[in-house]
């Protein structure tokens, strides 16, 4: 979105040191929000919005994904396209979900190693992003229990459409798709930021764990980002960030929501 608006500065550096505009006022309708999520950020989709119908874009996305799955990039990356499409469809239809390899394997009737192998291939081919849990020790950070996002939110809305699901009718799916959309705006910009941080999510263990959707880490400094699809923000929406702020490395935390104004919850929230 910032590239389309002609902003060359990375949002990642602004999250670290930028001064928020506390006088900001603005609003976005649910229809416009869903439209932006559906279009995503890839230039071939976003830049052709006026020339391409929704159905044409859907066919183009499906064709692009099929082409990526049909390429053998490395000798050991042979894949069965039937298995690949089945696994990818399940992952894309649950944006922001934490990967449960055993559950997915049971649902699709494949073994765990097959699921893990295909998820690894999808990440290398830039179809999905797998965020590890920051709370896990570095030597235990595997694909299992990663948080899965499409590399572009248009992939998810297309998968949901194929599954007969509609963001307009499912607030939970809208929340997950918005989370992926926001993360799609931030993670690519880490590559041209001054900080170039590593990306994680953060989640406590236990029955009712606190969680933060995206954590950026660089030089023992943390930035936390939580995403909410609601138009009103509550103090408890900052609970995950508050818990994360107990980490000595914490610098700032942000809640991205769909309301019309900036709200300061605390000096660093």
Which residue ranges define each predicted feature?
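Conserved AAA+ ATPase "SRH/arginine-finger" region at the nucleotide-binding site
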Residues: 1-2
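Interdomain hinge/linker elements that couple catalytic modules in large macromolecular machines
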Residues: 6-159, 163-164, 169-177, 181-184
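A cross-kingdom feature that marks ATP-driven nucleic-acid transaction machinery
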Residues: 120-121, 127-128, 132-269
């Amino acid at each position: 979105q910032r590239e389309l608006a002609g902003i060359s500065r990375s949002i990642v550096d602004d999250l670290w040191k930028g001064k928020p505009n506390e006088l900001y006022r603005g609003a976005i309708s649910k229809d416009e929000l869903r439209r932006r999520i559906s279009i995503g950020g890839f230039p071939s989709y976003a830049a052709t919005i006026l020339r391409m119908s929704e159905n044409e874009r859907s066919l183009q996305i499906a064709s692009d994904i099929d082409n990526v799955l049909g390429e053998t990039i490395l000798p050991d990356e042979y894949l069965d396209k039937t298995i690949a499409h089945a696994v990818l469809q399940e992952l894309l239809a649950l944006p922001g979900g934490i990967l449960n390899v055993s559950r997915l394997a049971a649902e699709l009737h494949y073994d765990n190693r097959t699921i893990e192998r295909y998820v690894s291939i999808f990440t290398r081919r830039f179809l999905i992003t797998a965020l590890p849990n920051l709370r896990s020790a570095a030597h235990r950070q595997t694909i299992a229990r990663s948080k899965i996002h499409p590399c572009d939110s248009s992939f998810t809305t297309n998968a949901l459409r194929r599954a007969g699901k509609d963001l307009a009718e499912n607030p939970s799916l809208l929340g997950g798709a918005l989370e992926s959309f926001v993360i799609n705006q931030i993670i690519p910009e880490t590559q041209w930021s001054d900080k170039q941080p590593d990306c994680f999510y953060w989640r406590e263990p236990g029955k009712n764990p606190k969680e933060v959707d995206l954590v950026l880490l660089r030089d023992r400094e943390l930035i936390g980002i939580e995403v909410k699809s609601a138009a009103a923000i509550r103090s408890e929406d900052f609970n995950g960030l508050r818990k994360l702020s107990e980490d000595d490395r914490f610098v700032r935390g942000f809640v991205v929501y769909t309301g019309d104004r900036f709200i300061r919850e605390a000096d660093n929230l």
